[in-house]
Amino acid sequence: MEKRDRRLGIRVGGLGKLIGVGCFIALGCSFAVARRPESRADKPGIIVRTHNYAGVKGDTLDRAEKETARIFREAGIDTAWVVCPVTSAELAQYPACLQPADIPRFDINILPRFMATQLSQPDTTLGFTSLTREGQRASDASIFLDRIKEEVERTHGSLTGILGDAMAHELGHILLRTSGHSVEGIMRAKWTPEDFRLASRGQLLFTPQQADLMRSEVRERAQAQIAAEPTAASLSK
């Protein structure tokens, strides 16, 4: 079990080192830098920042994140995870959330029931992304914890498994740049009881075609991010 205070650094899932000082049943659609090790530079990676509004226990969230990381590792994408605050007043306590990086970053908001209902999604929706049109590049998603718990109870499944798969599903929408779904795998629209059992056992995955598309998207975002960063020469002017 990880003991380090995750507010102070990035938990790495094969991605790199921290260097520094210190939509239906279903799913809807301080100065430090993080870098990939040279030996894995050809493998795309992302940083996922979690905002735990629902107050999921730390060890439960850790295991769910590791499940999401495993699913993306199977798809050829490394992940690093950062715990971020839920209020601006707490931001100074989470220096890892402010770290600059040349790696694409995404935010996942884990919401309690009263916050989830404000998004006006169907009662069977377990998650939601900020995509408003096909092909859009979004960067954040929300997960509805109470609805996931209801499915865990209904299917006698694993909370960490289903929560981890729900996060992977929503990140999948973002990286595939679509609110659409597939007929098989983790991007199915309506999850059956058997799908929830597979999720609990860690057997819902992205298809090879989806994995290819997501790796390309991560690389394109990383290149665009680097190109948009001001150079040392421009900063000196």
Residue ranges and their predicted role:
Residues 1-15:
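N-terminal secretory signal peptides that target proteins for export/translocation
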Residues 2, 31-34:
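Phosphate- and other anionic-substrate recognition elements at nucleic-acid/protein interfaces
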Residues 16-30:
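Bacterial N-terminal signal peptides
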Residues 29-31, 44, 50:
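Terminal transmembrane helix and immediately flanking juxtamembrane interfaces
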Residues 35-41, 49-66, 128-157, 161-162, ...:
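Metalloprotease/metallohydrolase-associated module, dominated by Zn2+-dependent proteases
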Residues 43-45, 103:
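A general structural motif
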Residues 45-47, 76-80, 186:
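Residues at or immediately flanking beta-strands
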Residues 58-167, 171-174:
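Metzincin-family zinc-dependent endopeptidase catalytic domain
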